[in-house]
Swiss-Prot record:
Chain positions of site Cleavage: 21-22, 39-40
Function: The role of the precursor might be to condense the viral prochromatin for encapsidation by virtue of the two basic domains.
Residue ranges annotated as propeptide in the record: 1-21, 40-68
UniProt-listed InterPro entries: Adenovirus_late_L2_mu_core (IPR008393)
A GO cellular-component term linked to this record: viral nucleocapsid
Name used for this protein in its record: Late L2 mu core protein
Organism: Canine adenovirus serotype 1 (strain CLL)
GO molecular function: DNA binding
Domain of life according to the entry: Viruses
Name of the gene this protein is made from: PX
Localization, UniProt: Virion
Length: 68
């Protein structure tokens, strides 16, 4: 794979202006969430979903590397 570059693109939302309404909204969500209910498993569900979503991308990179 000499001479080939692999580029990964990530989309990260960036806020340029934080208004008073935005700050208030963040406080409300923290207060509403409170303590995590349901234990350890609900915290793992988003991580498992992200891993499942990443599998096709990882597999395609592995296949491409194996072909070259």
């Amino acid at each position: 794979m000499a001479g080939r570059n692999v580029t990964l693109r990530l989309r990260v939302p960036v806020r340029t202006k934080i208004t008073g309404a935005g700050r208030r909204r963040g406080r409300r969500t923290r207060i509403r969430c409170g303590r995590m209910k349901g234990g350890f498993l609900p915290a793992l569900i988003p991580l498992i979903a992200a891993a499942i979503g990443a599998v096709p991308g990882i597999a395609s990179v592995a296949l491409q590397a194996a072909r070259h």
